[in-house]
Amino acid sequence: FYEEAQALPGVKRVAGMVKQDIELVTGVSPAGITSGQGSGCAVLYGTIGHSPMLDALEAAGKLDLNAIRGKWECYSFQVIETPLAGIGTALVIAGNDKRGTIYGLFHLSELIGVSPLVNWNHVLPRHQDTVVLDDRVNMVSRVPSVKYRGFFINDEWTAFGNWAKTHFGSMNAA
């Protein structure tokens, strides 16, 4: 996982959760990298307007962000070759806004078989020794038909609030 210093705090937090999901599936925790560092394959993620890496890839003609630019909570998956020096192939998850990037990261978890309910009722994924994602995963998400979608619990502080604080540090994704 290419960890960009400029990434939004909530996006960084979710990237960490997705790394845990990958570890649940493979038994191996993906390394975080801050440069190419000789990595054969990598996951790069960023939010338009908050990611110099996305800007550089787009300027070099390696990444097309026009399909998601300006679209509420949209993200794209693009597998590209040699995105950065030292990285052979990368899955680039780009979001138009913070939630778009977060939904894109969680889409990766779904692709490898992790249920969104893994934290709620311990729905553990099937073990896989390897996970292969190729250009068949290239896609652009649709604009959601409902803005501000989410799971809202208004009066359950005792149970849900304490659970959220234990697992996420607070009730807000930051």
Predicted regions and their residues:
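Feature activates predominantly on carbohydrate-active enzymes
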Residues: 9, 14-17, 21-23, 59-61, ...
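Short hydrophobic beta-strand segments
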Residues: 1-11, 38-49, 151-152
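Functionally constrained cores in energy, signaling, and assembly domains
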Residues: 1-3, 21, 32, 45, ...
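Short, well-ordered secondary-structure micro-motifs within conserved domains or adaptor modules
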Residues: 32-67
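Long, low-hydrophobicity ectodomains and other hydrophilic envelope-associated domains
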Residues: 17-19, 23-25, 29-32, 52-55
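Secondary-structure transition/capping residues
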Residues: 29, 33, 116-119
